[in-house]
UniProtKB/Swiss-Prot annotation:
It catalyses: DNA(n) + a 2'-deoxyribonucleoside 5'-triphosphate = DNA(n+1) + diphosphate. One of its GO terms (molecular function) is 3'-5' exonuclease activity. Its EC number is 2.7.7.7. SUPFAM superfamilies: PHP domain-like. DNA polymerase III contains a core (composed of alpha, epsilon and theta chains) that associates with a tau subunit. This core dimerizes to form the PolIII' complex. PolIII' associates with the gamma complex (composed of gamma, delta, delta', psi and chi chains) and with the beta chain to form the complete DNA polymerase III complex. Pfam families: DNA_pol3_alpha, DNA_pol3_finger, DNA_pol_IIIA_C, HHH_6, PHP, tRNA_anti-codon. DNA polymerase III is a complex, multichain enzyme responsible for most of the replicative synthesis in bacteria. This DNA polymerase also exhibits 3' to 5' exonuclease activity. The alpha chain is the DNA polymerase. CDD domains: DnaE_OBF, PHP_PolIIIA_DnaE1. GO terms for biological process: DNA replication. Belongs to the DNA polymerase type-C family. DnaE subfamily. The keyword NAD does not apply. This is DNA polymerase III subunit alpha. It comes from Pasteurella multocida (strain Pm70).
Length: 1159
């Protein structure tokens, strides 16, 4: 191979985010293909790609040069920032660039982060500076021809970076670039400055230029043809070959030679794959001994709880002691005692500070040491959970506890960790958003200037599934391939989108990842902050940050823990008033019969993980009656097991409809019974795979974990090796080789569906806790759940329906007793949370509750207005509170409150003015007009029920005092016998008929371009989504009117998207049509009170507008003398409309009018 002549020192990957589209791996491959011995990755103001670049480069035999392109400001250049390239000459330089990048983000920035030139002087050691070409400070001054300023600019680098400053030259066809090169070469000769050739690489190939321009336009929010779009780049900024660069700079050979010289000078060594933990304070003991001490103390406490009887405890102790010792030996030998102690401390702090912590998550629940240290709350021995699934001495990797915290307290825990280990030693982790399939189509389409409808049509052909790619979309949606093949514009758009798919678009914060450093985070990674310089995160993502040596801790927020806390707070407050002991959720029995009865009835709405329609169906079929069944439910309710048929095997075996075998009637072994008995012989868990390998073939559990992973990967060479090991081990244990391999094949088949039992058991415990709370404290539990959904009106509606089904009363919001959140009053009623009222913010609520706490309950509307700070509550807020029912106790009815609101506000305003003048007489202000107020109240007619309900729906999102459909329920039973809550999917060819209030409707277009109507029915027992296609839509579209009552017939099926049911409508009737079809007659009941001389004339006048119909009228008359039934003549027959019934009810009374049907 010939001697190298050039290397690229200034290259951007897609991690630059403002420009650059090349991925790190293809860049390294380009180096190898072009025989380049080194490469400098200099992404804009970040090291985000550094770890993978460093690793990939070394693996490929390419020397990695660490650097970054930065913006700098100086006194000389004023507010105009300039570009520099900083390269790390050694580890000191690497550390200094890390500090500089961190400082740029930490001080905040408006558009792009930048450095101060003074910082460069301060952190200059170990850094080589490339001048930034025509965009650098020297370049800008050269182009402007300011001799004195050129002198000053150069002097800075000669003073602070002697022998470490290079004038960078590039020839990419950019504006003023060639003039700069000429001036720079002259300056270099005059000042004795070295020059270096770069190509400012942004993409791999010349034909990637348009894709790059689109990427930049997406970032900058331009369209490609916008005349205002800055054109900063050219098609020459690709990864030029060595020969191309040599040809380009043949006239400046030193510029080429210096790339190699700089590459030789840059020698940074980064320690990857090691782990560095902060020192946990352990006093005089070593970290290992301290872990042993705390674990043994914790186990003793746990054993006293698990086995209160001393004899039983002593009998069980040896197996716990032995397991603990095995785990401690592994943890200490692998060097992880500090990790366990750190997690122990922040979890204990959380519990001490009333921040709920989950019982465990993931494989960590399989550790007895974790249980002893109270990191987890599930006894791993009781549920056959394996430590080796978490930490395997035969597969060295960091332990990884994912810890769930109450949503409200999670940030407090992270703050505590920062206080404990130092703010500079704790950071959250960056995460990167990429151009995903749907989004990249939309973005590219917008930049190319396509109409919204055109782009939307293509985007909607891409399935919304997580992890969807364009390649997967083409495989899943034939129409996408068809439109791609038939439309050149579509093809061009998709081809361009393919080039940009997966390109890093932006940076964000990882949901739960936190790193704790033994020193400063900046010893390992720069810090990236938001524009205000807050919320620091590492430049390395969750994988790279661990590879760089920092240990990741996952602090996850679980809403269910917050719900449990809120429920317990309400429960224990009530129990304290009653003189009863509090509920400790950690000590509830796991075999509560009442809880399992509720579970078997599938009444699991709001129960963690068990509330979806599909899960409810599985519960009905399984009829779980023990905690192990709940663990299995969590593991089985996934696409793989559901589609494989093993779920049905599990159900059939539980109910005796299939032989229980271990694992199969044809191929079983007695030694597997203890392993598979809890799951009726079905291999459900990964731990069972490991135990079978241990029991049948003599694997260590560590080796069995490797087998499990190999089965998951399905690599033929690995599986061939494992089959051999399994067969040999089984024969050595006296098991028939053929039988062993038959069982191996079965295990391999189910291993792909196997779930981590440790995670399933831990989450099953949370599920059970919510189930137990719903069973024994339903009001408090549902109030807590509704509080958690206060911002989601649709969810509140569903939960309210569930409360009605449970027999719980939900009282309207009450300004005198209610709280911001949902609560439970002394009558066991759930009181609607004031914070859930639309149009009422936290500020007004705080003002109202503060006034109530200071002066007691409000006597009336005038009293309230006089006592609250009206600067914090506007008129619209008061109106929302009246409409919602929150002020019902402040006046006779809502209409009166609404009418007198203006007077109450004026009186309050007058009171405030008088108080300011020293003439305060609140009671005078309020009582002077007391009689007038009473008169105003008395003279104000009540709102109709319809108006009241519309106000409730407007402010609460639901009907609380009643329901618009309530007056019709008796009548609707004649048209449809099935309530929505009782609906089940139809068999083929069958149809169901239901009725309800149409609460929403819309029209859409399918992927194939066909119209469909989508609507939602509500009959107060539940809700149902209905769809209308083709002929049905054409026939009934005009009847999909919101807030009307309709009767529909159609095919009912599961809705996989929502987890509920849906109906495809075949027939639809309005209420008037149903009456005309099914009603026999209209009954009018009269009494002596009605029979005024003018009554017949008035009744005829009322009925005349509705005459000409086919429904006959019967009059029932009752008096002291007797009763009779009279059929009115044909000329009296009417059309049975709602308006007619309303007028008759107003005239005769609601109970005097009724439809009659055939018996």
């Amino acid at each position: 191979m010939s001697e190298p002549r050039f290397v690229h020192l200034r290259v951007h990957s897609d991690f630059s985010m403002i420009n650059g589209i090349a991925k790190v791996k293809p860049l390294i491959k380009a180096c190898v293909d072009n025989h380049m011995v080194a490469m400098g990755l200099t992404d804009f103001t970040n090291f985000c790609g550094l770890v993978r670049f460093y690793g990939e480069a070394l693996s490929a035999g390419v020397k990695p040069i660490i650097g970054a392109d930065v913006l700098v400001r100086s006194e000389l250049c004023g507010d105009e920032p300039f570009e520099l390239t900083l390269l790390a000459k050694n580890n000191i330089g690497y550390h200094n660039i890390t500090l500089l990048l961190s400082k740029a983000y930490e001080r905040g920035y408006q558009d792009l982060p930048y450095l101060d030139q003074a910082w460069l002087a301060e952190h200059r050691e170990g850094i080589i500076v490339l001048s930034g070409g025509h965009n650098g400070d020297v370049g800008k001054k050269l182009l402007k021809g300011h001799a004195a300023e050129i002198e000053s600019a150069v002097a800075f680098y000669q003073d602070f970076f002697p022998d470490h400053f290079y004038l960078s030259l590039s020839r990419t066809g950019r504006y003023e670039e060639e003039r700069y090169v000429s001036l720079a070469l002259t300056l270099a000769e005059e000042k004795g400055l070295p020059v270096v050739a770069t190509n400012d690489v942004l993409f791999l190939h010349e034909d990637d230029f348009e894709a790059h321009e689109i990427r930049v336009a997406i970032h900058d929010s331009y369209t490609l043809d916008d005349p205002k779009r800055p054109k900063l780049y050219t098609n020459q900024q690709y990864f030029r070959s060595e020969q191309e660069m040599c040809d380009l700079f043949a006239d400046v050979p030193s510029a080429l030679e210096n790339t190699l010289l700089i590459a030789q000078r840059c020698n940074v060594t980064i320690r990857l794959g090691e782990y560095f933990l902060p020192q946990f304070p352990t006093g005089d003991l070593s970290t290992e001994d301290f872990l042993v001490k705390k674990s043994k103390e914790g186990l003793e406490e746990r054993l006293k709880f698990l086995f209160p009887d001393e004899k039983v405890r002593q009998a069980r102790r040896p197996e716990y002691d032995e397991r603990l010792q095995v785990e401690l030996d592994v943890i200490n030998q692998m060097g992880f005692p500090g990790y366990f102690l750190i997690v122990m401390e922040f979890i204990q702090w959380s519990k001490d500070n009333d921040i709920p912590v989950g019982p465990g998550r993931g494989s960590g629940a399989g550790s007895l040491v974790a249980y002893a240290l109270k990191i987890t709350d599930l006894d791993p021995l009781e549920f056959d959970l394996l430590f080796e699934r978490f930490l395997n001495p035969e597969r060295v990797s960091m332990p990884d506890f994912d810890v769930d915290f109450c949503m409200d307290g999670r940030d407090r825990v992270i703050d505590h960790v920062a206080e404990t280990y130092g703010r500079g030693a704790v950071s959250q982790i960056i995460t990167f958003g990429t151009m995903a399939a749907k989004a990249v189509i939309r973005d590219v389409g917008r930049v190319l200037g396509h109409p919204y409808g055109f782009v939307d049509r293509i985007s909607k052909l891409i399935p919304p599934d997580p992890g969807m790619t364009l390649a997967k979309a083409f495989a899943a949606e034939p129409q996408l391939q068809a439109v791609y093949d038939s439309d050149e514009e579509v093809k061009a758009l998709i081809d361009m989108a393919r080039k940009l798919e997966g390109v890093t678009r932006n940076a964000g914060k990882h949901a739960g990842g936190v790193v704790i450093s033994p020193g400063l985070i900046t010893d390992f990674s720069p810090l990236y902050c938001d524009s205000e310089g807050k919320h620091p995160v590492t430049h390395f993502d969750k994988n790279d940050v661990e590879y760089a040596g920092l240990v990741k801790f996952d602090f996850l927020g679980l809403r269910t823990l917050t719900i449990i806390k809120w429920a317990l707070d309400m429960i224990n407050t009530r129990l304290a008033k009653e003189g009863k002991p509090p509920v400790d959720i950690a000590t509830i029995p796991l075999d509560d019969p009442a809880s399992f009865e509720l579970l078997k009835r599938s009444e699991t709405t709001a129960v963690f993980q068990l509330e979806s329609r599909g899960m409810k169906d599985l519960i009905k079929r399984l009829q779980p009656d023990c905690f192990e069944d709940i663990i299995a439910l969590v593991a089985l309710f996934r696409p793989g097991p559901l589609e494989s048929g093993m779920v049905q095997n599990f159900i059939d075996r539980k109910h005796g409809n299939e032989v229980v075998a271990y694992p199969d009637p044809e191929y079983q072994h007695d030694s597997l019974k203890p392993i598979l008995e809890p799951t009726y012989g079905v291999i459900v868990y990964q731990e069972q795979v490991m135990q079978i390998a241990q029991e049948l073939a003599g694997y260590t559990l560590g080796g069995a974990d490797l087998l499990r992973r190999a089965m998951g990967k399905k690599k033929p060479e690995e599986m061939a090796a494992q089959r051999e090991i399994f067969e040999k081990g089984a024969i050595q244990k006296g098991v028939d080789g053929e039988l062993a391999m038959k069982i191996f094949d079965l295990v391999e088949k189910f291993a792909g569906y196997g779930f981590n039992k440790s995670h399933s058991a831990a989450y099953a415990l949370v599920s059970y806790q919510t189930l137990w709370l719903k069973t024994h404290y339903p009001a408090e539990f549902m109030a807590a759940v509704m509080t958690s959904e206060m911002d989601n009106t649709d969810k509140i509606v569903g939960l309210y329906d569930e409360c009605l089904r449970m027999g719980l009363k939900v009282a309207p919001p009450d300004i005198n007793t209610g709280k911001h959140h949902f609560s439970v009053n002394e009558y066991g009623e759930i009181v609607y949370g004031i914070g859930a009222i639309k149009g009422v913010g936290e500020g007004p609520i705080e003002a109202l509750i503060s006034a109530r706490e200071q002066g007691g309950i409000f006597k009336d509307l005038f009293d309230l207005c006089a006592r609250v700070d009206l600067k914090k509550i506007n008129r619209r807020t008061f109106e929302s509170l009246i409409l919602s029912g929150a002020f019902d106790k402040l006046g006779p009815h809502r209409a009166a409150l609404s009418k007198n609101l203006e007077d109450a506000l004026k009186a309050s305003d007058q009171h405030a003015k008088d108080a300011a003048m020293g003439q305060a007489d609140m009671f005078g202000v309020l009582t002077e007009s007391h009689e007038d107020v009473e008169k105003a109240y008395a003279s104000t007619p009540r709102w109709s029920e319809k108006v009241i309900l519309e106000g409730e729906r407007e402010t609460l999102g639901l009907y609380l005092s009643s329901h618009p459909i309530s007056p019709y329920l008796k009548e609707l039973a004649h048209y449809s016998a099935t309530r929505l809550k009782d609906l089940v999917p139809n068999s083929r060819g069958q149809m169901s008929t239901v009725s309800g209030l149409l609460v929403s409707s819309r029209f859409a277009v399918t992927k194939k371009g066909n119209r469909l109507g989508i609507a939602t029915l509500d009959d107060r027992s539940g809700r149902l989504d209905i769809t209308l296609f083709g002929e049905a839509l054409d026939k009934y579209a005009d009847k999909l009117q919101k807030d009307t009552v309709i009767i529909v017939s159609g095919q009912v099926s599961f809705d996989e998207f929502s987890g509920g049911l849906k109906m495809s409508v075949r027939e639809l009737m309005s209420l008037d049509e149903a009456r005309s079809r099914y009603a026999k007659s209209l009954a009018i009941c009269l009494s002596e009170e009605n029979m005024k001389p003018t009554f017949i004339r008035e009744l005829k006048a009322l009925l005349t507008p509705y005459s000409g119909g086919t429904l006959p009228i019967y009059v029932y008359y009752a008096s002291t003398a007797g009763q009779c039934r009279v059929k009115m003549g044909v000329q009296w027959s009417v059309n049975p409309t709602d308006q007619l019934f309303t007028e008759l009810a107003e005239k005769l009374g609601e109970n005097a009018v009724e439809l009659e049907f055939q018996s």
